Amino acid sequence: MLVVFQRVVRATVLVGRKDTIRTVKTHSGAKKRWILTEDGKSFKRKHAGAQHLNRDTSSSTRARQRQWEEANTIQKRVLKRLLPFK
């Protein structure tokens, strides 16, 4: 009986010894939270904490939570490593 296994190979990186190869994968948490901007140079995300229990917060706080937040310089550097295929 022939069994075929499908493997998702994205990219390979040599690590340490020559016979050790590690697959580069996208960080799934970052993939769900960050999207690439229209110009393709930065990332943006929504604010956390705007889903429920907002009755006692001010209208300016709720309006600020509806806006998009752009990644700063350090976050961009980390996101390039976490999201290698974007």
Swiss-Prot record:
Belongs to the bacterial ribosomal protein bL35 family. It comes from Schizosaccharomyces pombe (strain 972 / ATCC 24843). Gene3D superfamilies: 4.10.410.60. Keywords: Mitochondrion, Ribonucleoprotein, Ribosomal protein, Transit peptide. It comes from the Eukaryota. This is Large ribosomal subunit protein bL35m. Pfam families: Ribosomal_L35p. GO terms for molecular function: structural constituent of ribosome. The keyword Cytoplasm does not apply. GO terms for biological process: mitochondrial translation. GO terms for cellular component: large ribosomal subunit; mitochondrial large ribosomal subunit. Its main location: mitochondrion. Component of the mitochondrial large ribosomal subunit (mt-LSU). Mature yeast 74S mitochondrial ribosomes consist of a small (37S) and a large (54S) subunit. The 37S small subunit contains a 15S ribosomal RNA (15S mt-rRNA) and at least 32 different proteins. The 54S large subunit contains a 21S rRNA (21S mt-rRNA) and at least 45 different proteins. Residues 1-18 form a transit peptide. Residues 45-69 are annotated as: Disordered. Component of the mitochondrial ribosome (mitoribosome), a dedicated translation machinery responsible for the synthesis of mitochondrial genome-encoded proteins, including at least some of the essential transmembrane subunits of the mitochondrial respiratory chain. The mitoribosomes are attached to the mitochondrial inner membrane and translation products are cotranslationally integrated into the membrane. It is found in: Mitochondrion.
